[in-house]
Regions:
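Active-site metal-binding loops of divalent metal-dependent hydrolases
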Residues: 21, 113-114, 286
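Conserved N-terminal catalytic core of the sugar/cofactor nucleotidyltransferase
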Residues: 2-8, 13, 39-124
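Residues that scaffold the ATP/ADP-binding catalytic core of kinase and kinase-like folds
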Residues: 24, 160, 191, 243, ...
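Conserved alpha/beta core of the MobA/IspD/sugar-nucleotide pyrophosphorylase nucleotidyltransferase superfamily
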Residues: 153, 174-277
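Structural signal for interior beta-strand "rungs" in well-ordered beta-sheet cores
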Residues: 261-411
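Glycine-rich N-terminal loop/short-helix segment of MobA-like nucleotidyltransferase
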Residues: 12-36, 52
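Conserved core of the sugar-phosphate nucleotidyltransferase
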Residues: 66, 117-200, 207-209, 214, ...
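Short beta-strand/turn micro-motifs composed of small residues
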Residues: 18, 61, 111, 138-139
Length: 411
């Protein structure tokens, strides 16, 4: 009888480095709590870690502003405190000491200020550990100022030298370390405590583990990340704005390539998840946040703001309109200067005109509210004509009350 040995169970731990002081943001709050593309920077990183089935996700805090610590606690994210701010190796050592030992595990290390690393890239890096002990995420940059340089010997990575410790010759190397590292847990635990602080900053650099592994004949692999949006970090408000602008232009350009008529990709901000059908036209200065879907043959006028809403087909959203948390049926006309608030449903062929606000209401088919009105907590049937200046008085100072107007009425 042949007895096959069981393969050791392998799982993934992700460590997010978030212990920085955020001094270059010139702000009282952590840079990780600035929003980019509609969400906090730390949320983007955490989602990437969660999407690749990390068994443990540990966020390393330290001198982080209190708002970040409160956010981590509120969202029940596992965290550890780095008591002394003395480098990334010490941060990783603190994190790895907080989880149960499993030398067969893989450990992924992410930077908390690099928001757009993709799950696809992370999976490819992790798969490289099947044939190596450590995988580095690298990229080629025309202007690599500020980044650690990748040192190779006959194509093999032997060391990473940080910018502050680099000679003028090494600074000419344009292959840089992205800060994203995947390593076998057993190897990490063996070498993390051997890292020294023999550098100008007197810090314990995690990147020094590369030379330790190379000197001890461990196998080091790399994965070149070609999309620069995935590797761009945020240290200042300028970094934040520059990265978001690049992302927004890319999103708008992708939709343009798919047949959406976007009048100006430089002035269209898609900050969330925008799904668009055929023959949609979007004018300038429009902002889309959270999940927005737009049906075919629909036109969005200039200066519109759409957030968490569903727009039907053959709809005309006129300029300067705000739609938030609402559903707009087919063949509707909305605006200009209309405000459609959460809980509102416009049935097919309804019309809401200029300076009209609708909140938490159902507006029936072919019903028209064309001028200067407030409709709140109401249910309007079909084929109603609401004249200018109408208000549904929904609040008595203590409670909200519903207004019902039945079909074919004229107000």
């Amino acid at each position: 009888e042949i007895v096959l040995a069981r393969r050791p169970k392998v799982s993934l731990t992700t460590i997010i480095l978030a212990a920085g002081k955020s001094t270059r943001m010139l702000s009282l709050k952590s840079k990780l709590l600035f929003k980019i593309s509609g969400e906090y920077i730390i949320e983007h990183v955490y989602r990437a870690a969660a999407s690749i089935n990390s068994k443990n996700i540990v966020c390393v805090l330290g001198n982080s502003p209190q708002q970040l610590k409160d956010f981590i606690q509120k969202n029940k994210i596992q965290s550890v405190d780095q008591k002394n701010s003395c480098g990334t190796a010490d941060a990783v050592k603190t994190a790895i000491s907080s989880i149960p030992v499993n030398k067969n595990n893989k450990v992924l290390i992410l930077c908390g200020d690099v928001p757009f690393i993709s799950p696809v890239t992370l999976r490819k890096m992790i798969s490289k550990l099947n044939n190596s002990d450590l995988c580095l995420g690298t990229c080629i940059q025309e202007n690599p100022v500020g980044y650690g340089r990748i040192i190779r010997n006959n194509k093999n990575i032997v060391e990473i030298i940080e910018e502050k410790d680099a000679s003028s010759k090494i600074k000419k190397i344009n292959e840089i370390n992205t800060g994203i590292i995947c390593i076998n847990e057993g190897v990490l635990r063996k070498f993390i405590g051997k890292i020294k602080n023999n550098n100008k900053q007197k810090e314990y650099y995690l990147t020094d583990i590369v030379k330790l592994l190379s000197d001890n004949d461990y196998k080091i692999s790399s994965y070149t990340i070609k999309n620069d949006l995935e590797t761009m970090g945020i240290n200042s408000k300028k970094d934040l704005v520059d990265l978001e602008r690049k992302l927004l232009i890319k999103k708008a350009s992708n939709l343009l390539d798919k047949g959406v008529l976007i009048r100006d990709v430089m002035r269209t901000d898609i900050k969330g998840d925008l799904k668009v059908q055929k023959d949609v036209e979007i004018d300038i200065n429009c902002i889309f946040e959270d999940k927005v879907s737009i049906g075919s043959n629909t036109t969005i006028g200039h200066n519109c703001y759409l957030n968490r809403c569903k727009i039907g087909k053959n709809v005309h959203i006129k300029p300067n309109t705000i739609i938030f948390g609402a559903t707009i049926g087919d063949n509707c006309i909305v605006g200009p200067y209309a405000r459609i608030r959460p809980g509102t449903v416009l049935k097919n062929d309804a019309q809401v005109g200029n300076f009209v606000e609708v909140k938490n209401s159902i507006i029936g088919s072919r019903t028209k509210i064309n001028h200067l009105s407030y409709i709140g907590d109401a249910e309007l049937g079909k084929d109603i004509n609401v004249g200018a200046g109408c208000i549904t008085c929904n609040y008595d100072g203590e409670k909200k009350h519903k207004t019902i107007i039945e079909a074919n009425s004229f107000i």
